[in-house]
Amino acid sequence: MMTVDPIQDLRNICLQILQSVNSNTLLEEETWDYNTLINNIDLPKQTREALRRSASQYLLYCQRKNKTYTTRKPLPAKAKLQLVETFSKKRYLTRCEKHQLAVQCGITTNQVQIWFANRRKRSKDLNNRD
């Protein structure tokens, strides 16, 4: 049975494993550090290492599952017009030009770079289709 707390879930899984292997009272105590928990289990070293890797992956999975993502925000209309106008004049920008355009548009230089790369790809695809 899985709960909301991944550490508690891991503890329950370890308890189930130990019940099938041998009895160990360590897990019945309130131990929240899974490394300490696994180190004190009376199992072969390889089994402990595999359990540690699994526990680590499980905790990462739980953290990713509960992560909130920010939604993508479209470029401002003013920025898009400026980018299109600049692209019609010049398809490749220098680092300095990217920075100046980003400041003018109120976006990051990375957004300018990606926008230009995407626009070049779209232009190439449209030309190849014709």
Swiss-Prot record:
Gene Ontology cellular component annotations, sorted alphabetically: nucleus
Q: Name one Pfam family in it.
A: Homeodomain
Cite the SMART domains for this sequence: HOX (SM00389)
Query: What's one GO MF term for it?
Result: DNA-binding transcription factor activity, RNA polymerase II-specific
Keywords of this protein's UniProt record, alphabetized?
Answer: DNA-binding, Homeobox, Nucleus, Transcription, Transcription regulation
Which sequence positions fall in the DNA-binding region?
Answer: 68-127
Entry annotated with the keyword Transmembrane: no
Say where the protein is mainly found. Answer: nucleus
Cellular localisation: Nucleus
Q: Which CDD domains match?
A: homeodomain (cd00086)
The miscellaneous comment for this protein is: There are three genetic loci for mating type genes in C.glabrata. MTL1 seems to be the expression locus that determines the mating type of the cell, whereas MTL2 (containing MTL2A1) and MTL3 (containing MTL3ALPHA1 and MTL3ALPHA2) appear to represent silenced repositories of mating type information.
Describe its function.
Mating type proteins are sequence specific DNA-binding proteins that act as master switches in yeast differentiation by controlling gene expression in a cell type-specific fashion.
The UniProt family comment states:
Belongs to the MATA1 family.
Q: What is this protein called?
A: Mating-type-like protein A1
The gene from which this protein is expressed is MTL1A1
